[in-house]
A protein has these predicted regions:
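Extracytoplasmic/secreted envelope proteins and their assembly/folding machinery
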Residues: 2-6, 51-54, 238, 248
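Core structural elements
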Residues: 22-32
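Acidic/polar loop patches that form or flank catalytic/metal-binding clefts of enzymes
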Residues: 15-16, 63-73, 213-214, 222-225
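Glycine- and acidic-residue-enriched helix-capping/strand-helix junction motifs
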Residues: 33-60
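Cofactor-pocket helix-loop regions in the catalytic cores of large enzyme subunits
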Residues: 1-18
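Acidic/polar, compositionally biased interaction segments
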Residues: 75-249
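Loop/turn elements at helix/coil->beta-strand transitions in domains of secreted/extracellular proteins
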Residues: 4, 22-24, 63-68, 209, ...
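Conserved hydrophobic/aromatic pocket- or pore-lining residues that grip, position, or stack substrates
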Residues: 5, 25, 57, 103
């Protein structure tokens, strides 16, 4: 099946592109802007830097007067992507990311025992999450709160998702939106130890500030949580890709 699904293309003097003959180039696909550059698990190493196709090609053609036309084309995510970094801020600050607060026990009462700022949407033990607590002699029992101020880039219906090893939920402006806390089903993520993802949708307005809080409770030495959000599509993605291709000299 894998062999039959492959298509072999012959390069008949198409590549490499002649920059002197191209004024517009189309970059189409969901991995053009944010590509998957490494694997998961033991292959999930964090590189010193990343260059994704849109960024790399744009930098290469920066001085060539070549216009880059980008279109996402479709969604291929198994899990929802992270909140846009440029639209998410530590509450009360201009810094992008989440304020992460750690509490002892199963509640969020009192002052947090530790705070840090993190970015991304996947946090687990094998990448160093909560490392300072996992080395303790006593089996850790912690509650963690991820908080960010989110300013939606467009108005519409946003879909949020969360799953974890342990209990998790998402709140928007203090109101619970996604509940993977009161009941759970077995999932596939994190070596099959996590619960299945749960999702819910909410209408948000462009430019308005929303407090997004992800609450997480775990017991043991293998914390793992992932959460994401898909914003509404401003256009029909497939139609947009077709228009971009027609308007370009190379795709």
């Amino acid at each position: 099946t894998a062999t039959e699904g492959m298509v072999l293309l012959k390069n008949e003097e198409v590549l490499p592109f002649d920059k002197t003959k191209i004024s517009k180039i189309a970059l189409i696909g969901p991995n053009v802007k944010d590509s998957q550059i490494i694997g998961g698990g033991s292959a999930g190493l964090k590189p010193h830097y990343e260059v994704h196709p849109l960024e790399g090609i744009s930098n290469f053609l920066r001085d060539e007067r070549v216009k880059i036309n980008y279109a996402k084309g479709c969604h291929v995510d198994k899990y929802l992507p992270a909140l846009e970094k440029e639209s998410s801020y530590v509450p009360g600050k201009k810094e992008n990311g989440f304020e992460v607060e750690f509490f002892r026990g199963k509640t969020f009462d009192g002052e947090p025992i530790a705070k840090q700022v993190l970015s991304g949407n996947r946090f687990w033990a094998l990448q160093g999450f909560a490392r300072e607590f996992l080395d303790e002699k006593e089996r850790p029992e912690l509650s963690v709160k991820f908080s960010t101020t989110y300013k939606p880039p467009i108005s519409g219906e946003y879909e949020f998702e969360v799953f974890s090893i342990g209990l998790s939920r998402i709140k928007i402006n203090g109101k619970e939106l996604v509940d993977n806390w009161s009941s759970q089903k077995k999932g596939e993520a994190f070596f099959g130890f996590a619960c299945a993802p749960k999702r819910n949708k909410i209408k948000l307005s462009r430019g308005r500030e929303y407090l997004v809080e992800v609450e997480y409770e775990f017991e043991g030495r293998f914390p793992a949580i992932q959460f994401g959000c898909r914003p509404p599509d401003p256009k029909n993605l497939l139609e947009e890709a077709g228009k971009v291709a027609k308007q370009s000299d190379a795709v």
